[in-house]
Amino acid sequence: MPSYFRRAAVQHALGSVSSYQTRLEQWKAEGQKKGKPYLESKQYAMPVFYHDVMYRKNTEEKDAAFLKLYDGRGWKWFAVRLKHTDMEYLRKHWSGKKASAPTLEKKHDKYFLRFTYAEEVSLNRTPVKEQTICSVDLGINTDAVCTIMRPDGTILGRKFINFSSDKDRMYRVLGRIRRFQREHGSRQAQGRWAYAKRLNTELGRKIAREIVLYASEKKADVIVFEYLEMKGKLSGKKKQKLQMWRKRDIQKRCGQQAHRKGIRISRICAWNTSRLAFDGSGEIARDTRDHRLCTFQTGKRYNCDLSASYNIGARYFIREILKPLPATERSLLEAKVPAVKRRTSCVYADLRELISEMELRKAA
């Protein structure tokens, strides 16, 4: 085995041990009794093809490269053809960026070369009073509802993101799996479940791309999501689990794509964002036939996910406005607007009331 492969294996082992020691120290510092981290001995590390010694570009062909591989007798250079569309994507989006050594990757019993690039990006430092945010509600009936909001509660734009055909395809696959499992059992349906998960992952990619694209078009400084509990096992039907996994994947992908554009990511408490009406009238009543719509206690008909996106953006600004204030000034504002004390029940109407109260205090 070449020394370069041995060096990569040693570096991977050092990184795994260092990560384990860090997690163990954090676990001891928190004083927890359960969830003690452990060192996984089987890492399944893939080899790294270092430049010039294990990997070389093909100067004669654009979509080809040379890899040093073992043919049973010795290590020799072999020409490998790369997919034209993948190489065009790299040339279009990553030309001029610092490229790291490619790594071998195995997915679905196939091997791929994973190319990694390094890029320095500075996140924006826009003050809260000048920020424009994109609050996102990841729903069930509608994939995502985005609202562009200013600190005073002004709504600059709204967008409904929904890939209905992709969801219908996935739900048809789930229906076939359910009928198949009734006849043959769940053990023989693993391949079908893997296909459903791949459809779910692809749907998450599309939704995340649309969210970041819309936030970038509207020049948003922050994308605000609900905080989703990421620990523990998920209970419920497999369909519900797929929806939760997709929401987690969307938030993760949005964070990665938004940071490349200098956009920050923030999360707020998810309690009651969909249950409470944005106008402060109280709990909503969802329609039994069309779950996208609801009725406020005032009799107003509105979209549930759009109301939730208003509340998500309002909670972000309430938190960011009150957090840097001195304790005395914050207490006076909370006395005038008692609803902002509990972040689990704040709605869009409370933000408007808080802003008006702050303006009155400035005028006085």
Can you say where each PLM-predicted feature lies in the sequence?
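Nucleic-acid substrate recognition interfaces
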Residues: 1-364
